[in-house]
């Protein structure tokens, strides 16, 4: 039986080896080393040959990393070498594209699972064979799966609350008059409780000095039971009457007597309406004056109460301080600078 060295000297073996080298897929020649920089290679055939050489090294080391007899340190070293070979392969593929060759990176797709999601660990640093079972790596894959599940749940909850109307978020509660009345009652009770607590703390026994609850919001809102069309008709009624009065002045002469009677009745109605308006305005003015007097008395009482609390201060301390003029301020700054120069040079 012939030895390997004798087989290597045969004519057929040398012919096949030279043929593979010429095609760019042959084995590495004796003493021939792969260039460290892919950009240093200017031949497309040589670049194809070195890429094939890297693929054979990757295949051999991926098969070797499956060995159960290897230790964890050897598995880590082999996995690092495989990732380094993948980086070199990418560099040679870029050089092949620059030299006008085929684009091998176009055929490399993204690995996905049954649900169409990208498999973790397919980008950047990869783990092969037994490297996926190393301590710390298995937890990394489990964590990425849990993170994807949490992101899908977060997206589902976002879609659930995405197309909800303003009623869902309580933006239409202010249109409910009953709810506003209830809130006003509770706010009034809370106001009165806090006022009593503050009065007991400050030692105020007179209830007339206590601040009253502000005007409720519900009193400013229109009544929901009244139809808005009815309100519009009431607003348009005086405009129609004015137009009718203007139109009566342009009637024919034969209806002059009837028009005079109608105008007389309308004038009487207008005078009565003016009287009622003046009466209501007088009443409103009297009520407003009474409210102003009450507010003035309340302010005076509050000022008296504040003066009682501030009895420890004299009148001069409560006055507004007198501000220095521009010249006085310049003199003060000049004195400060002189004092600083004296301290700097030791002159006292």
Swiss-Prot record:
Keywords on record: Cytoplasm, mRNA processing, mRNA splicing, Nucleus, Spliceosome
Transmembrane segments: none
InterPro entries, A to Z: Helix_hairpin_bin_sf, Isy1, Isy1_sf
GO cellular component terms listed in the entry, alphabetical order: catalytic step 2 spliceosome; cytoplasm; post-mRNA release spliceosomal complex; post-spliceosomal complex; Prp19 complex
Ranges of Basic and acidic residues composition bias in the record: 264-278
Location of the region described as Disordered in the Swiss-Prot/TrEMBL record: 220-282
Localization: Cytoplasm; Nucleus
Keyword Transmembrane helix (UniProt): no
Pfam families hit by this protein: Isy1
GO annotation, biological process: generation of catalytic spliceosome for second transesterification step; mRNA 3'-splice site recognition
Keyword match Disulfide bond: no
Biological role: Involved in pre-mRNA splicing.
Quaternary context: Associated with the spliceosome.
The family this protein is said to belong to: Belongs to the ISY1 family.
Name of the protein this chain belongs to: Pre-mRNA-splicing factor ISY1
Protein species of origin: Cryptococcus neoformans var. neoformans serotype D (strain JEC21 / ATCC MYA-565) (Filobasidiella neoformans)
Lineage of origin: Eukaryota, Fungi, Dikarya, Basidiomycota, Agaricomycotina
Gene that encodes the chain: ISY1
């Amino acid at each position: 039986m012939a030895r390997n060295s004798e087989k290597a000297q045969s004519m057929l073996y040398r012919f096949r080896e030279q043929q593979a080298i010429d095609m760019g897929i042959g084995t590495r020649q004796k003493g021939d080393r792969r260039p460290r920089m892919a950009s240093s290679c200017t031949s497309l055939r040589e670049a194809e040959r070195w890429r094939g050489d890297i693929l054979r090294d990757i295949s051999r080391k991926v098969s070797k990393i499956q060995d159960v007899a290897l230790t964890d340190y050897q598995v880590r070293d082999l996995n690092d070498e495989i990732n380094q070979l993948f980086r070199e392969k990418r560099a040679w593929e870029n050089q092949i594209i620059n030299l006008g060759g085929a684009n091998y990176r176009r055929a490399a797709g993204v690995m996905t699972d049954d649900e169409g999601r990208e498999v973790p660990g397919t980008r950047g640093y990869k783990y092969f064979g037994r490297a996926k079972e190393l301590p710390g790596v298995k937890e990394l894959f489990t964590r990425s799966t849990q993170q994807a599940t949490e992101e899908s749940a977060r997206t589902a909850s976002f879609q659930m609350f995405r197309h909800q109307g303003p009623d869902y978020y309580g933006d239409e509660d202010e249109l409910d008059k009953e709810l506003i009345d209830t809130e006003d009652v509770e706010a009034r009770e809370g106001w009165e409780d806090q006022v009593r607590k503050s009065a007991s703390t400050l030692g105020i026994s007179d209830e007339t000095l206590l601040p009253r609850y502000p005007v409720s919001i519900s009193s400013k809102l229109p009544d929901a039971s009244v139809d808005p069309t009815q309100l519009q008709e009431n607003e348009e009624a005086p405009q129609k009457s004015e137009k009718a009065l203007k139109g009566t002045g342009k009637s024919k002469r034969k209806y002059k007597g009837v028009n005079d009677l109608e105008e007389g009745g309308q004038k009487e109605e207008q005078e009565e309406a003016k009287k009622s308006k003046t009466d209501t305005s007088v009443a409103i003015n009297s009520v407003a004056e009474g409210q102003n007097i009450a507010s003035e008395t309340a302010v005076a009482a509050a000022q008296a109460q504040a003066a009682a609390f501030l009895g420890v201060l004299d009148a001069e301390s409560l006055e507004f301080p007198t501000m220095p003029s521009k010249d006085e301020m310049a003199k003060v700054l000049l004195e400060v600078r002189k004092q600083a120069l004296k301290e700097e040079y030791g002159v006292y």
